[in-house]
Amino acid sequence: MQLELLNEQGQATAKVDAPDTVFARDYNESLIHQIVVAYQANARQGTRAQKDREQVHHSTKKPFRQKGTGRARAGMTSSPLWRGGGRIFPNSPDENFTQKVNKKMYRAGMASIFSQLAREGRLAVIDSITLDAPKTKLLAAKLKAMNLDHVLVIADEVDENLFLASRNLANVLVVEPRYADPLSLVFYKKILVTKAAIDKLQEMFA
């Protein structure tokens, strides 16, 4: 597979050979869906909590006598059948949403995403991306010159200048290959990869 090599003006100046094992795999929609959903599920935190009938603070006194009232029998007001009572199946902050994806499937899914991005023309290569100072406007100017406004940059090494400059750009994410995730790959309109990062991606996902 050959990918376009962009200059600092966003023009394709040459072609770069990329490993077919990562950038020319068959499109596997179900596997991609699985690893994206698993990534989102594993990022979830237990932020919901409700009380069951044991946890609500109600009297345990029987609200009315068992027989003779014509009403349905009731033992306590904390019953889930009563207004203000506990939930039958309450949400718990200890709930585990983890979904396991084995390494072989994850590598295959990531390679399938990279391959589809290459086929759609959303993946491009640049020699390197460096900044002289940690200034957001410097990085914004570089990306604007390449006509990139919604982009994931995968650099072989993210130095402090590049990291600090990218933090304040809403639609720009700069990561090293080891931090590339399936959700970001499918979310961003354009993926910009440095030449040195291609070798690292091959080691990880081939």
Swiss-Prot record:
Instruction: Cite the entry's keywords alphabetically.
Output: Ribonucleoprotein, Ribosomal protein, RNA-binding, rRNA-binding
Q: Cite the residue spans of the region called Disordered.
A: 46-77
Question: Where in the chain are disulfide-linked cysteines found?
Answer: none
Q: Name one Pfam family in it.
A: Ribosomal_L4
Gene3D superfamilies in the record, alphabetically?
3.40.1370.10
Renumbered to this chain, the Basic residues biased-composition regions fall at 58-70
Q: Which InterPro entries match?
A: Ribosomal_uL4, Ribosomal_uL4-like, Ribosomal_uL4_dom_sf
GO terms under biological process:
translation
Molecular function as annotated in GO:
rRNA binding; structural constituent of ribosome
A GO cellular component annotation here is:
ribosome
Q: Which family does it belong to?
A: Belongs to the universal ribosomal protein uL4 family.
Function field: One of the primary rRNA binding proteins, this protein initially binds near the 5'-end of the 23S rRNA. It is important during the early stages of 50S assembly. It makes multiple contacts with different domains of the 23S rRNA in the assembled 50S subunit and ribosome.
Subunit organization: Part of the 50S ribosomal subunit.
| Protein's name in the database | Large ribosomal subunit protein uL4
Q: Which organism is it from?
A: Leptothrix cholodnii (strain ATCC 51168 / LMG 8142 / SP-6) (Leptothrix discophora (strain SP-6))
Gene name as annotated: rplD
